[in-house]
């Protein structure tokens, strides 16, 4: 039931002028589902995030103590006269959740914390050697296992008192000595308690007290002595016993849980035993990551058909027979073992390739000559290229070097835990027949089903009731926002922006907060129409809890479901920033000034092409694609067409294109890429000569990167300024107008315009440079003008303004025109690229690629290009795509937007569901052919609703 509006129940905004907003006044109803829409760059985010949310955050920070604020940075007051009725604000944006490889969907949602509690409290330990469930062990059972060790074995019985704890433990050592003990095992080394034991207080230590040293004799006296020692240990450690053997290995026993047949025992079941971020539970080899970075032969050997002299070994390809010490050492190996340099790598025998990669087992003569001419001869083992890469990757302190060596490495599943992340003890505990990691590998849908069907006894039900309820609730929230195809083991860094946002949305629903203002940025991104209504219902649940939802959105279904719709425009950039229309969706549709309203009412629409492209008759065929959930499928992609890859979320679209097609073609065309086991065969790669992936990844990560530098138009602009009369008189070259080199840039901020303040434990904070006032250049450089504008003034222009300004300069105006053509006319030339959305970054890349002359044999790959685009902007994008296809090129697009799908020349629909139930081709053909397959395809069902009958 929707809450009734009260006359004074509004967020009142007066005089909003942030960015391009033109003194906007608006009353936004509280406790409602409010959508802000408008063309890209019209000012939606400026109103929602930079004004309303920013003011909410500023007021929150103002309420904190000055001590707390120093760690959170300053929050400037947005350019607005007044905001009244503002509730506590929470922003749910599209930023990736975490880049930490330890963060998973389970940890960021905190569901894994509840799972650890559940497995620790009601899980049942099982012997990994197949001896059934493990029960608690008696002292005599443990003594029997120690007594059964080989006769005359020398063992030491230890009491583990400190496990992975920091400190110097001086008082503990004194206490042990007072109790009459003589020795301790500290971090694997035996000390007497008379020794001065100095420990680093910041390092984690393991300490065990030596209770007895025994030679195993098969007599009653030895057995009694073992029992007495175990009883002493039990009093010190609550049942944990260690036995140190002669060879240094330690046997672990526990009164808590142990197998009476093979002696396997585990420590007390605690939640931290199941944490892959805890030293207690994480695998000792991979430290809980589940993988390790190892050199990859396929990346080290660029092309096995080439010889070493021809550059087959990638790291040596530019220094073959040069003076590099690395090459000279390698040449010593080659000469010693007579490995031919002119023979293709694939023709070398296995032992020769092993020497190249793994090095020599014996010392060999290594000859080198330094740059100064000094000769050096040493006899030593040559470590091999693979070991060289691994060592330097670990040792380097340079991020650039680490990334360079990373290019020759791959993630390899941990050979000890086999990707399970946890130690054997934790994995031996089962609930419903599976371990905790196996549960996290189930899809959200299947994990809910598993928990609902879980059979527990009365005691387990009582203990686990609350944790089970919380887990099922949180999993259900994830399902309701369309993430049922994911699993809790999914690494957070691999989630898309839309998926990460919906996870945060589900987390907020679980918090059951009321009276909050939620500001969201396109939550429908990456969501199939099938799941869209579930997302809308979820947002309505949040509204019905008594919250205000302020959603920036372009999706028609979401706009029509809103209680209140705000249209900002009428256009983008300086031509936007006005309140065009507001009210119910019906009221906005009736407003003739609203472009959004015209699209919603059907008065304006993206037209269906009368004739679809017939293509050039050539194809690329992928056979046996089997990455992730792909079911060994064969896919045919027709060329010189707009090919749409569709399907529900998680159906395998990215697996097919981004993880199979793209790397396969890059391997063939550019001699780079991944191993061939992701598919069986690819046919027709010779039908293209180039593949261009236009992704939504950032185009730069520093304040110096901007659209002008990325598309190379800034070089031309700098040349123009350097050729002015005043610049020539002063002797300025084009480098004077670069903020990347000394000379013309500000010496205080080094051309950044901002000063970076390291926060150590928090993200770095950037503040405007007080010397240049954010203008990046020194005052002398800014004195040079072209048609009355300084270089900084030009960077402040929008793409459209700059196009008009430089219209008479063809090499500049042509590049700027392309930015306008892809719908970025509003974008500031000098904007920091870290502020760009994924969709904006994608379109900037597209405009750069369009600068190059087409060969007619290029394959473009776009991943959800509709992200951040209004229907009017989609129209512009489709015009560009049609231009590409007319040049003879091919465009492959992963997309959910029906307005793009309906103009496709060919559609490949994957499904039928997401996750394990996806990965198959359910329908394919032209849109007209697809809608005849509605019984098999969700996409076809929704597409049939918008295709006009007379177009079929």
Swiss-Prot record:
Residues 316-595, 615-944 form the ABC transporter domain. Pfam families: UvrA_DNA-bind, UvrA_inter. ATP binds at residues 38-45, 647-654. A zinc finger (C4-type) spans 259-286, 746-772. GO terms for biological process: nucleotide-excision repair; SOS response. Gene3D superfamilies: ABC transporter ATPase domain-like, ABC transporter ATPase like domain, ATP-grasp fold, A domain, P-loop containing nucleotide triphosphate hydrolases. Coiled coil: none annotated. GO terms for cellular component: cytoplasm; excinuclease repair complex. It is found in: Cytoplasm. It comes from the Bacteria. Forms a heterotetramer with UvrB during the search for lesions. This is UvrABC system protein A. It comes from Mycoplasma genitalium (strain ATCC 33530 / DSM 19775 / NCTC 10195 / G37) (Mycoplasmoides genitalium). The lineage of its organism: Bacteria, Bacillati, Mycoplasmatota, Mycoplasmoidales, Mycoplasmoidaceae. The gene is uvrA.
